[in-house]
């Protein structure tokens, strides 16, 4: 039986790979997509997501979400993904539009209609998920779990300690981590290992139309290089759904720093239980890299 999922995303070049896997992995049933401001503005992430759905002829509803964080000014990652978020490939024109309601309400409505609890996957800032949990707490029993790409038990990637998706809206992340729902966190500890090698990248143009498109996007992606390999951060959240055996997880108490002058957005991961607080997150700490690379090759071969 395929696993029903809703995907909250901010495309973003590595998001495009994660979306491909969510659509084409035979184990998954992608039923709803929502967008959030993150890598670029929400208008751009929505445009990019619709372009990808049209490219794959995927009839999946999409709702546009939060344009700004809960409290603070927005930040982006255009330096990594380019000003448009997905530069490098000329997508054809289409007339697709997002749903006419905000993302968190679209998630609420879809959860309440679902015949069974649904897994939420968030690979951008957690603003939409925080709005859902704070404004619609009645939805919690209908959430099977939340799988996120975000955070780190060690170094950050936009500050010394903070990972971008959490740092972009720390208050939202803090709300989500306090919510009591089941959370799996695929942070930089594993995503920095999730590298597609130059040898594999060179085969993409011959793979299929998706391979050609992704190869064009990757030439503008600044999380590594075509010569040294590219990190597929967001793809790890999808990989865990399909191949949890590739990941080493540990239950930990995790809090999000929202006040620190130098540490705002840091995920404080209590690996050794120093704080004496009960675990609220399953934290991915290690990855079977070769197994991950093999799985990526298999799923992208299906993305025709």
Swiss-Prot record:
- Signal peptide span: none
A Pfam family matched in the record: IU_nuc_hydro
Q: Which residues form a coiled coil?
A: none
The keyword Ion transport belongs to this UniProt entry's keyword annotation: no
Example of a GO biological process term: DNA damage response
The active-site annotation reads 233
Protein name as annotated: Non-specific ribonucleoside hydrolase RihC
Additional comments on file? Strictly specific for ribonucleosides.
Q: Which family does it belong to?
A: Belongs to the IUNH family. RihC subfamily.
Role according to the record: Hydrolyzes both purine and pyrimidine ribonucleosides with a broad-substrate specificity with decreasing activity in the order uridine, xanthosine, inosine, adenosine, cytidine, guanosine.
The annotated modulation of its activity is: Subject to catabolite repression.
Enzyme Commission numbers on file = 3.2.-.-
Keyword annotations for this protein, in alphabetical order, are: Glycosidase, Hydrolase
Q: Which HAMAP family match?
A: Nucleosid_hydro_RihC
List the PROSITE patterns hit by this protein, alphabetically: IUNH (PS01247)
Gene Ontology cellular-component terms listed: cytosol
Gene Ontology MF terms: adenosine nucleosidase activity; inosine nucleosidase activity; purine nucleosidase activity; ribosylpyrimidine nucleosidase activity; uridine nucleosidase activity
């Amino acid at each position: 039986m395929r696993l029903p999922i809703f995907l909250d995303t901010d495309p973003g070049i590595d998001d495009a790979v994660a979306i491909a896997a969510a659509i084409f992995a035979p184990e998954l049933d992608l039923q709803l997509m929502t967008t959030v401001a993150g890598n670029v503005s929400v208008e751009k992430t929505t445009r990019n997501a619709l372009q990808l759905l049209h490219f794959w002829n995927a009839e999946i509803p999409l709702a546009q979400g939060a344009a700004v964080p809960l409290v603070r000014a927005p930040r982006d990652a255009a330096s990594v993904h380019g000003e448009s978020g997905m530069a490098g490939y000329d997508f054809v024109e289409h007339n697709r539009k997002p749903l006419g309601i905000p993302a968190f309400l679209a998630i609420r409505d879809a959860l309440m209609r679902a015949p069974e609890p649904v897994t939420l996957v968030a690979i951008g800032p957690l603003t939409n998920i925080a709005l859902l949990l704070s404004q619609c707490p009645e939805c919690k029993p209908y959430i099977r779990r939340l799988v996120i790409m975000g955070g780190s038990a060690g170094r950050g990637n936009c500050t010394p300690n903070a990972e971008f998706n959490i740092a972009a809206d720390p208050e939202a992340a803090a709300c989500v981590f306090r919510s009591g729902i089941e959370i799996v966190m695929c942070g930089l500890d594993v995503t920095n290992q999730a590298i597609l090698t130059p040898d594999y990248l060179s085969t993409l143009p011959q793979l299929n139309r998706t391979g050609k498109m992704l190869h064009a996007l990757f030439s503008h992606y600044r999380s590594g290089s075509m010569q040294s390999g590219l990190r597929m951060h967001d793809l790890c959240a999808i990989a865990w759904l399909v191949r949890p055996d590739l990941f080493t997880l540990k239950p930990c108490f995790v809090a999000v720093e929202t006040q620190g002058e130098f540490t705002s957005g840091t995920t404080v991961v209590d690996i050794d239980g120093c704080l004496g607080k009960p675990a609220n997150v399953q934290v991915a700490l290690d990855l079977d890299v070769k197994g991950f690379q093999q799985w990526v090759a298999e799923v992208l071969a299906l993305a025709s």
